[in-house]
UniProtKB/Swiss-Prot annotation:
The lineage of its organism: Archaea, Thermoproteota, Thermoprotei, Thermoproteales, Thermoproteaceae. It comes from Pyrobaculum aerophilum (strain ATCC 51768 / DSM 7523 / JCM 9630 / CIP 104966 / NBRC 100827 / IM2). Its cofactor is Zn(2+). Belongs to the peptidase M48B family. Disulfide bonds: none annotated. This is Protease HtpX homolog. Pfam families: Peptidase_M48.
Length: 347
């Protein structure tokens, strides 16, 4: 979500962000701990999706029943126009982003990688053709594209050097899993919802401030609903991030099916081990507009092809600590949790 650049929007954004920080630091870890292990992966995804949709629907219902009567004669038209604009901008981004990614990362076809992608896709029963491309940069991989541009699986040249054949197949399986699960389209849809709620809130506050009070409306009610919407939009954003992390576990199951749980674990462990030794490597990907696509979300450096991981290394990584606070704001789960998840995975 990006605030409109005016003092009111900036102030609301700060209030919402502070609220999100408080939730992430206090309530969210306790809730996550209390429900940990109580749901299957599919149950957790369904529950989180329902919470996102119901919370968004409640705010829209609140606008229609409480705020709309105080928005003047053109309130409904403005409301629908705003929602249409937010949805349209996101759809345009969805269809344009593959071209931007290809340009940004210098994507180029690779016959050897294409052969591996085709083999893994057949193993997973993918019903569509996938385009395999090699890109420059750190050891990473990502899935992008759509039915118009084609569906891509991108692997960096340094990832090719870092992994052996089975580990590479697991990484590719993870990315094909994103395509099979329609994650790009699903996360586009869910990502739109907090943006809609946020901009509805900002607009309501603006209209309340501009109201002269002679139209029969109550600016105070309109402002209160607007502020509440902005705050709740940040809560919805936290839920969307949680949903994204669950989709990553879901994609890991595809990687494990493609090449085995151990291959998926060792691929993740190699990435983790390399970047743990290069803490400065996190900055570039953290600033990337496409970081949510990566198999590993906070990495960037020149990979050392001689990184190796032993079974004892793997077990040590599983036991390593991670920041719960940082996890709540991430699109990807911590590697130790993903390794433990794969341990418990059964086919």
């Amino acid at each position: 979500m990006f605030p409109i650049f005016d003092p009111v929007a900036l102030g609301l954004y700060i209030v919402g962000y502070i609220f999100m920080l408080i939730i992430a630091a206090t309530i969210a870890p306790k809730v996550a701990k209390s429900i940990s292990g109580r749901f299957t992966l599919y149950g957790a995804m369904a529950l989180t999706a329902v919470l996102v949709v119901l919370t968004t629907a409640f705010i829209i219902y609140l606008f229609v029943t409480v705020a709309l009567p105080h928005m003047g004669a053109y309130g409904l038209s403005f409301l629908l126009g705003l929602i249409f604009f937010v949805v349209l901008m996101n759809i345009i981004t969805y269809f344009a982003s593959p071209y931007l990614i290809n340009l940004s990362y210098g994507a180029r076809p690779d016959p050897r990688l294409q052969q591996i992608v085709d083999e893994v896709a057949a193993r997973l029963g993918a019903p569509f053709k996938l385009k395999a491309v090699v890109v420059d940069g750190p050891p990473n991989a990502f899935a992008y594209g759509n039915f118009l541009t084609g569906r891509y699986v991108a692997v960096t040249s340094s990832m090719l050097a870092l992994t052996d054949r089975r580990e590479l197949e697991a990484v590719i399986g993870h990315e094909i899993g994103h395509h099979l699960h329609r994650d790009n389209a699903i996360m586009l849809l869910f990502g739109i919802l907090p943006s809609i709620v946020y901009y509805l809130g900002v607009t309501a506050v603006h209209m309340a401030m501009a109201s002269s009070g002679n139209r029969g409306g109550n600016p105070a009610i309109l402002a209160a609903v607007g502020i509440a919407a902005v705050i709740v939009s940040f809560l919805i954003q936290l839920l969307v991030l949680a949903f994204s992390r669950l989709r990553e576990y879901y994609a890991d199951t595809a990687g494990a099916k493609a090449a085995g749980k151990e291959a998926m674990q060792f691929a993740l462990a190699k990435i983790h081990k390399f970047y743990f030794a290069n803490p400065e490597a996190h900055e570039v990907v953290r600033d990337s507009k496409f970081r949510a696509l990566f198999i590993y979300a906070l990495v960037n450096a020149v990979a050392n092809p001689f990184v190796s991981v032993t079974r004892s290394d793997l077990e040590e990584i599983k036991r390593s600590s991670y920041s719960v606070f940082q996890e709540i704001f991430s699109t990807h789960p911590p590697i130790p949790k993903r390794l433990k998840f794969l341990d418990e995975l059964q086919f």
